[in-house]
Amino acid sequence: MLSRPEPFLRELESAIPDRPFAVRFWDGRTLPATNGAGPTFEVRSPDAFAHVLLSPGQLGLGRAYVSGSLDVDDLDGGLEVMERWRPPELERREQVRLALAAARAFGVRRPPHVPKAELRLRGRRHTVERDARAVRHHYDVSNEFFALFLDESMTYSCAIFSRGAETLEEAQRDKLELVCTKLDLQEGQRVLDIGCGWGSFAIHAAQHHGVSVVGITLSEPQAELARKRVAERGLSDRIEIRVQDYRAIDDGPFDAVGSIGMVEHVGSSQIDAYARQLVRLVRPGGRVLNHGIGRLRIGDPEAGAFTQRYIFPDGAPLHLSRIQAALERAGLETHHVEDFRNDYAETLRHWARRLDDNLDEAIRLGGPERTRVWRLYLRGARRGFETGFTSVYQVRCSRPIGARRSAAPTPQSSRPGSDGAAPRRSQAQPVQPSG
């Protein structure tokens, strides 16, 4: 039961007089919405206030949700409210003051337990060892868990919805084929797939373009399943899956290099070394495609506290200009840049719906905390793309042959279906000097 709730409830109501949401407490008391119908936030335990008190902002609210001490009847609506409704009254200091008042009113005397799904890495960032630990935290939840929401190809990166009403499977096939087209893959070539995941690009490239592929990942379970999928398709003679850091690859050069959804894990301190390694790994005249998430605004934080602790430890989506400058300083020539922000928002919408459709199995495989982490993350990430906080880019480059600049045409757009037959939802970006 609430011990001395009334003064606090009056203070909360006064601090938030215009509320597009309701708050319901664990004893049934409710602070109703005052500005139309909206989501209801359910405070299931005083620990919710303690989490916010100890870590005001995104991390405290995330911990409260993951632990189950805070819930919301409409998660999408709740995130939209938090994104759009940011009154000056609820700046961080006010959050702390209200949380402290709640702790006193409800007799909170101990720090709450931090959810087990949280990770806080130690040591210097972006060493080989720490990067391996970060990847294990994200991917080793289980292959079966990811299969609940990914498409049948197990492609864990942005799909491309060029036709408007295609399935997730079709959109992922379009993306994989687009990567092959941009790399200009030819039969008999040797290709490197950095961050190969469960092998979707390697399998597609080998099956449809007759190339051989070396794919690398830092996740042992991921590599095991990728090898199994390769063997099932009779491609073991053309695809090699390794557990290896990109910095340790020493058997280049390759005819083409694809890095899909990996650059956001590299970090600002390592981006130049990463770009130099790409140059070392591709033959003169060969192509490189760098596909990854980036920030849209210079000066935005690299990754939120919740994402750092629960999803992508040490994740650092950089601004496009920072990535492109590193690639060009290393010696690559940029030919084409394309933005797929709307497509990633749609991809995340599909993933979130599929996870919800398999919620009981997700809880069985990953546990309730981990499942809540992913339900929150998939929706929060989608909001980031929809509101313009983040985007995803494909940067197509080549390594010049000696001092001569490589000749590679820059198309108006290389999206599937961009021949006028269907509207395009993302636009090719002109190549700008990177400085």
What is each residue range found by the language model?
Residues 247-257:
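A short acidic, Gly/Pro-enriched loop at the edge of an enzyme's catalytic core
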Residues 285-293:
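Conserved beta-strand signature within the Rossmann-like core of class I S-adenosyl-L-methionine
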Residues 272-285:
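A short glycine-rich, Lys/Arg-flanked "PGG" loop and its adjoining helix->strand segment in the class I
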Residues 226-227:
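Conserved SAM-binding loop
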Residues 198-209:
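Conserved SAM-binding loop of SAM-dependent methyltransferases across substrates and taxa
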Residues 1-166, 170-172, 178:
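Feature captures hydrophobic
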Residues 293-405, 412, 416:
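Substrate-binding/catalytic lobe of Class I Rossmann-like enzymes that use SAM or dcSAM, i.e.
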Residues 187-195:
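Conserved class I S-adenosyl-L-methionine
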